[in-house]
UniProtKB/Swiss-Prot annotation:
UniProt source species: Borreliella burgdorferi (strain ATCC 35210 / DSM 4680 / CIP 102532 / B31) (Borrelia burgdorferi)
Name assigned to this protein: Transcription-repair-coupling factor
Higher taxonomy: Bacteria, Pseudomonadati, Spirochaetota, Spirochaetia, Spirochaetales
UniProtKB keywords: ATP-binding, Cytoplasm, DNA damage, DNA repair, DNA-binding, Helicase, Hydrolase, Nucleotide-binding
Record has Repeat as a keyword: no
Chain span(s) of sequence motif DEEQ box: 711-714
Any matching Pfam family: CarD_TRCF_RID
Helicase C-terminal domain ranges (all copies): 774-933
Amino acid sequence: MNIDEELTTILKNNSNLKKMKEFLEQNIFFSLTGYEGFFKAFLIKKIKEYSKTGKIILIVKDEHTLDKIKNDLQVITNQIFELNYFSPLVYKGIGSKSTIFNERIKFLFNFYKKNPGIYITVLKSLLSKIPDKNTLLKNIYKIEKNTNINTADIEKTLITLGYEKTLRVTIPGEFTVKGEIIDIYPFGEQNPIRIALNFDKIEEIKKFNPLTQLKHDNEILEFQILPKKEIIWDDKTINTLKTKIKSVEYKKILEELDFKKETKTEEMFYPLVANTYLGDEIEKHTPIVNFEINNFEKEIEKIHQEYEKLYKEAEEAGKNIIDPKRILLNYKTFNLKSDVLFSKIKSLKSKETIEFKIESERNFFSNIALTKEEFENWLKNGFKIIIAAESESQKEKLKYIFKELPKVSIEVLKISSSLIIEKEKIAIILESNIFNTGQKINKAFESSKTKAIDSFVEIEKNSHVVHINHGIGIFRQIKRIKTSSLEKDYIEIEYAEGEKLFIPIEQTNLIQKYIGSDPKNIKLDKISSKTWIKNKANAKKRIEEIADKLIELYSKRESIKGIKYPEDNELQLLFESEFPYDETPDQIRAIKEIKEDMMSFKVMDRLLCGDVGFGKTEVAMRAAFKAVMGNKQVIVLSPTTILAEQHFNTFKKRFKNFPIKIEVLSRFIKNNAESRILKELKSGKIDIIIGTHKILSKKFTCKNLGLIIIDEEQRFGVKEKEKLKEIRISVDCLALSATPIPRSLHMSLIKLRDISVLKIPPQNRVKIEAYLESFSELLIKHAIESELSRDGQVFLVNHNIEELYYLKTLIERLTPYARIAIIHGKLTGEEIENIMHNFIKKAYQILLATTIIENGIDIPNANTIIINNANKFGLAQLYQLKGRVGRGSQKAYAYFLYQDSEKLNERSIERLRAITEFSELGAGFKIAMKDMEIRGVGNLLGREQHGEIESIGLDYYLTMLNKAIEKKMGKISSDEEEVDIKINYSGFIPENYAKNEQDKILIYKKIFKIQTEEESKKIRSELHNDFGPIPEEINSLLMLAELKILAKDLNITKLKEKNRALEIEYKNIESIPMEKIIEILQKHPNLLILNPSYQKSIFLSFKNIEKSEKINYIYKNINLLKTST
């Protein structure tokens, strides 16, 4: 449903809308009042439609207001542009976020191009200068189909515009050149573009998906590429700046601008080199709309006071910054007049006021009977009723609940409020008003974002690798070797004592990234040593044992009959509808899998894997609710008292509208309460009991236990695990783990153990604003004071325990009034629990900690985290720590600090920036998560596996495990051998096709992992899509891979070139197709040769065959053995 069109039709005769149009046509200043909720956005869009220029300027007070209005407007239009102001933190040495630069340049470009739209600006942006039209538009780079470009020139231009050359484009501001393909991810765009060249001519321009790398269908004839920032620091601009500031005072900044053409906090200087104001550039007859700013003078004064305070603090800290009086207009010089005023109350400033009567809130508090009664009354009175569902799955649930009211429309609508207009008899009711959940947070999910990253993505120059036959070495380079008339690439791997092997590219599939030990502790294998063979044999033995155990467990579980629960009832649907977020696709899948288990006779023993915050608890609560609806009791088992308390609070809040009794057992519960709980558990009065391993003791018995939910099972002791094994035999079990597991292990175990994996994170339920900065007392003081001023709490994390106490002294000096606690691994378990308990209860405002907080509890009130010496942590750790905040409804902040004295290299800075800049994390992050996957393997298969993983590497370990399970389950034959191909050919990746070695390894790995003809077709398509037309040299490699598939199908084990003939060796004599050979010889007498000395072989003659045609010739003729009749 198009809500904008729907409302426009319903309100087509509305007198207020007619008045609005008249006033705008006659240039009469008027105010609007009585509007509510989403209706504000509808009115703003109407003003834009009535505008003579097709655009409006909407002035809002601040960023918060801008975000709220934008969210509603996005439902009904995509013509929205925003001009936010730069962060005031520039006065503390912190640059603005890249998104602000992107949105500003998009706003200014469209504004100067006179494109229709709603142009939203915060008041601050009107007080500061912007570049004029000519200055801005001259920096736009235009590309057109069928025009000629020079790749060297385009690279130079893009770098000038602020773009960065990378191996693969994944985020705005990156570009790459791959042969005749140029990928650019323009600033301000949702998707990158791919330019296909034919020599220097642009043959095609298309957008593509940065995750799948697949092109969109629609072709683009021309495209305009925006610069990163509105100011380009060319020589002229830098010289202008030098005349405006004391060059001695700002020497360092000026040097950076001269050298790098950009610098942190450079936006502070923009108004000094810009030359106009937005207010002076607004086109005539464009309505200027004031959104709820009742007193411009007062608001402008507040802005000046804010900046004056920051300026004074920075001066006291010895920082050189620009006086705000030089860059901000004051009220006297601000002369912009509004045409329309949105006002919550009737304004005296306008003679004309249009008053609407809109209701945006009507809560039904999950009382479905009351809701139905109200709806029936509305329908009798001729109302049109629309329920705004949050998602398709919610729509289906609502259809079921309101099935007796067929006249009630149920549509998926992403609006922020209900809308009731009595006069026009329309009621649009949010599902959150029916279920009293508050507005759901909606984000779009792409399943492709969870696409598995194969190990080949990670193999980089000088990284550790495993060759299946030779062991652990270091990948040095891809080396081109010419011998007589042949030319091939080889992979150079260095082993212990500097020994080197040159591996033919056909063996790329035998090379994997080594993941196991810390790089400092990795021991390289010796080529001639038997250590690798021994390590492989030991690992194989242990893997066989693990596979046997898993298969035995699987068989035992399959033979037991369990509880069969009924289908979902109305209460279950109501419970699920009250979830205050949209489910991720993975959550929906996991819930479906769990319910299918519960509604069958098999005993459920399912593992639910997913990172902290990925939604495991919600999935578990739905399973618990289903068990209670089936008249069964539920145990929720937690490894610590604090986690048990947290689960109790979460369950109580989530189940509050339902008649389900929940209790918690922990050491914080008094003895008399414990004995009451014990009795009620035994009598069946308690539906859900939450607690630590104490619940497993004999004195606690349930009347009718149906489900046990285990949180972080690996953290329990041996005794508890043994007890759980007993319970699992007859009771459904759902185990939760926050440690991710590798996809390959998941695929291995999927047949033996029921596993649901949550790999898609909820898309930024609350935005975390992250900063990467050098250590600064001023910054730490600001971060803490800002959080405490909104009654929040702060984490300050450091890798070193001793330094925590130094930091405590520093914080006490900076914020003497703050209540501070310290927590680290040297404290006892009880001490840690007490401190955390008190922090949750807000007895402390600041918690100084090591990475002990990286996993576990949610503290919604703690929304600022400062990580000192961030460069000392792994990327995975930083990601986990960042996830400690943003768990509630407040905006969250993460500060990643490093010491200036450390002189971090560019790679280290980029590595850290990946965490701070982008919520969408790519391959680099997934690679960093591998250390967590090792923990995941240990958790699933036993910690004792760690030694084997270290000795042969994680990827090879999992390959062996997968084969062992497949073999024992009869899925593959005992020893499947690779086809041994020894053919003289020329095959490599030309330099102009893929220049960097990472891309080359990726291509080689893909080619030599091909197992089917379909895979070959897919890879041919991918290569053409990513790099351009496939050259002859790569085609030879693909033909070689396809030849291997064909040989395998025909039971051929070896293809070996000998004296202008090819030996074709079969697995056994029985495999030789003698009838087909005779048929071929009758037609082509000299094509095949039989030699009695080679009983399992035949020979293919290829005299007078060109080298370039050789593999094609071999493929075609071996194919005759399969297809001749």
